[in-house]
UniProtKB/Swiss-Prot annotation:
The active site is at S48, D193, H196. Originally the subunits of the type I platelet-activating factor (PAF) acetylhydrolase was named alpha (PAFAH1B1), beta (PAFAH1B2) and gamma (PAFAH1B3). Now these subunits have been renamed beta (PAFAH1B1), alpha2 (PAFAH1B2) and alpha1 (PAFAH1B3) respectively. This is Platelet-activating factor acetylhydrolase IB subunit alpha2. Belongs to the 'GDSL' lipolytic enzyme family. Platelet-activating factor acetylhydrolase IB beta/gamma subunits subfamily. Alpha2 catalytic subunit of the cytosolic type I platelet-activating factor (PAF) acetylhydrolase (PAF-AH (I)) heterotetrameric enzyme that catalyzes the hydrolyze of the acetyl group at the sn-2 position of PAF and its analogs and modulates the action of PAF. The activity and substrate specificity of PAF-AH (I) are affected by its subunit composition. The alpha2/alpha2 homodimer (PAFAH1B2/PAFAH1B2 homodimer) hydrolyzes PAF and 1-O-alkyl-2-acetyl-sn-glycero-3-phosphorylethanolamine (AAGPE) more efficiently than 1-O-alkyl-2-acetyl-sn-glycero-3-phosphoric acid (AAGPA). It comes from Rattus norvegicus.
Amino acid sequence: MSQGDSNPAAIPHAAEDIQGDDRWMSQHNRFVLDCKDKEPDVLFVGDSMVQLMQQYEIWRELFSPLHALNFGIGGDTTRHVLWRLKNGELENIKPKVIVVWVGTNNHENTAEEVAGGIEAIVQLINTRQPQAKIIVLGLLPRGEKPNPLRQKNAKVNQLLKVSLPKLANVQLLDIDGGFVHSDGAISCHDMFDFLHLTGGGYAKICKPLHELIMQLLEETPEEKQTTIA
């Protein structure tokens, strides 16, 4: 599904500086510097769902102790993440676990293309960081009431359930979270704008994610012993 040039969602591309302040590139450059200055065991990369996670106490509680870096940029698509990873954000580091969460902003792409873009990210990480275990977080439902974007995100997750097991070192973590109630509505207590998560919403995602990360870190006992020593 990640057919290279035939899939626009799998073609690396820097974000267009529409607003004119070059903040996207500034953030990317800061991440590249972080790669030179820090030694993360866990790397998070993606869009605002990753970026905003560090604004809540649960990041400091669960992920900061794991020497985690947060390379999330609001508005990013699979194309933008691919470009960033190809241009320095995987250099000078050797993380044990890499968490990928991106795709809900790929508005110009079909579900098949989005899934292919995510697969391309996984394949790139496998090439550049072969020691890393990769966790792909499933796309969340969005919008207060049922809508086509919810259906599209759900289809992306279904496609990834089939395709990701064929790739190395990766697993999909598709957390239900109970965000969609029995009447089909999403609560602002979970997603304050019916897209981005509240602190309580993040807790529903981050706790099972943290458990999986810890399991993967435990699978490298020799490295853990070295770290403790």
